[in-house]
């Protein structure tokens, strides 16, 4: 039966689940159900066999945001708030803050974490949430077309859809790295790469920024004792690009602090093009971070770095997407590059939330991969978690994780301990070789993905990750942001690096004989015999 124009406003009963062999029974009469993603253009087949999409299209003068407002159903009763992280025995057990409060640290100076009303969410079985999230995939219905906001109840449940700032981020590709696993990793047959860099600004930072900028958009429309005039961040490149794009979409001023000459030109041009105020500072990321924290304490500028835990709520949806893409089966390993270390905790939050609410029955083991030139977490791990020391990060091709004093160190430790996780490092040569080798099997990886891949090579060599282990490598950014490092590698223009997988272009005279000589040689290298037929 064709859907009606008001289908989005309908509540729906819990559907029978294909995921559970023993469906749970409970009283749902008092519950308000979240909505499936349907819109006025949804429709089935007409009696004549033609579709009815045109008949049920929204009015021409109405956009998808206005359509969502018109068809909005009753509000659900889910909520979230800030709590100190991690909870301490000597802290105030009642300390919590509204998400509408502009606050970044607890009274003791520690981090904050977004906590959800898990009791309210748990009133619905895991099968319900699986079916709900699956029903929203591939839609343009506002705001559920986003991979983040399709899981709105797990992200920012209280925000009005009209306040959401989305560029339809997420829903990124999870692809089977068949040849890399088979030929270069000892016959791994279940190796996957989660392409978080295939997003609006080319990195996973979009997932967190849509959540943060949406909340800022909400706050700017509310009566505040201290208005928010803009949003600011320190960045190694990708955060500034994401913040600038989302602020531009919402008409909110963006201010970014960048370490001079330490990010790629592709990363630099993104905030410039999106109209942000860009400050180039003669310091490293950690120096930029100290300055932005001082500035946001004095000026009405909202802090957008991962010190602000709102971003992690969006980033955790990548973990839920992985579960969806495996039909709610849990991988054995997930390998994540780590710099400021918020992302590994975000992945843990996503997996653990799904486990706690019954969507899955376990969480994967996590691996955090660091560049050896910026490896404070690796050193802490190797000390048995007994001696953390920040450091001055050395230059690395994986510039986005060139961080020596990570804000989210405590978060990362919690995630790794809870998942029996591992920390591994990669030298500059190891990460560049891993990147090049992956590219030769069909990828176009960024250097940070190269760090994660190099960690995978090491863990396979050590026998820690098995041949048949389902393993996901998280690719955090698009390779096109880091082309100079690839150019230098294939030109063999990197000091003290062999560049063993370099594939430089071949200069050839523009005549048939010269071209044929080169191709004969190359094809012989490939083990190919060519036959030249002369007529």
Can you name each region flagged by the protein language model?
Residues 2-535:
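PLP-dependent amino-acid enzyme catalytic core
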């Amino acid at each position: 039966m064709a859907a009606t124009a008001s289908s989005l406003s309908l509540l729906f009963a819990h559907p029978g689940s294909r995921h559970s062999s023993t469906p749970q029974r409970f009283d749902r009469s008092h519950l308000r159900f979240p909505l499936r993603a349907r819109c006025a253009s949804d429709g089935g087949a007409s009696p004549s066999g033609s579709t009815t999409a045109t008949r049920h299209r929204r009015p021409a003068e109405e956009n998808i945001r206005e359509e969502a407002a018109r068809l909005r159903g009753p509000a659900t009763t889910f909520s979230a708030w800030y709590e100190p992280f991690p909870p301490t025995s000597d802290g105030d057990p009642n300390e919590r803050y509204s998400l509408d409060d502009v606050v970044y640290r607890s009274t003791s100076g520690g981090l904050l974490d977004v906590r959800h009303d898990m009791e309210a969410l748990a009133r619905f079985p895991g099968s319900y949430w699986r079916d709900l999230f699956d029903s929203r995939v591939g839609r343009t219905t506002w705001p559920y077309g986003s991979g983040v906001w399709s899981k709105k109840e797990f992200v920012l449940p209280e925000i009005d859809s009209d306040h959401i700032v989305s560029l339809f981020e997420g829903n990124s590709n999870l692809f089977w790295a068949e040849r890399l696993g088979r030929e270069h990793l000892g016959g791994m047959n279940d190796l996957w790469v989660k392409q978080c860099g295939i997003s609006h600004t080319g990195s996973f930072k979009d997932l967190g920024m849509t959540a943060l900028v949406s909340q800022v958009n909400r706050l700017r429309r509310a009566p505040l004792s201290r208005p928010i005039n803009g949003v600011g961040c320190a960045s190694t490149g990708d955060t500034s690009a994401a913040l600038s794009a989302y602020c531009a979409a919402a008409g909110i001023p963006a201010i970014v602090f960048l370490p001079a000459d330490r990010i790629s030109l592709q990363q630099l041009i993104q905030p410039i093009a999106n109209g942000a105020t860009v400050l180039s500072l003669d310091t490293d990321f950690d120096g930029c971070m100290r300055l932005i924290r001082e500035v946001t304490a004095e000026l009405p500028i909202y802090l957008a770095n991962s010190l602000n835990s709102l971003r992690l709520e969006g980033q955790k949806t990548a973990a839920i997407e992985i579960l969806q893409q495996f039909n709610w089966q849990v991988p054995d390993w997930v390998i994540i590059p780590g710099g400021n270390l918020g992302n590994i905790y975000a992945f843990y939050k996503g997996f653990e939330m799904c486990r706690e609410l019954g969507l899955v029955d376990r969480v994967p083991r996590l691996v955090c991969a660091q560049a050896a030139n910026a490896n404070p977490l690796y050193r802490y791990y190797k000390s048995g978690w007994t001696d953390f020391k920040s450091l001055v990060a050395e230059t690395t091709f994986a510039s986005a994780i060139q961080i020596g004093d990570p804000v989210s160190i405590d978060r990362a430790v919690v995630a790794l301990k809870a998942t029996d996780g591992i920390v591994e490092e990669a030298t500059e040569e190891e990460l560049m070789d891993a990147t090049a080798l992956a590219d030769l099997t069909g990828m176009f990886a960024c250097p940070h993905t190269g760090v994660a891949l190099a960690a995978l090579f090491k863990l396979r060599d050590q026998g820690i990750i098995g041949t048949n282990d389902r393993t996901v490598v998280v690719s955090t950014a698009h390779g096109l942001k880091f082309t100079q490092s690839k150019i230098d590698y294939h030109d063999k223009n990197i000091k003290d690096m062999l560049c063993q997988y370099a594939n430089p272009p071949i200069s050839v005279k523009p005549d048939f004989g010269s071209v044929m000589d080169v191709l004969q040689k190359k094809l012989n290298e490939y083990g190919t015999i060519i036959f030249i037929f002369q007529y």
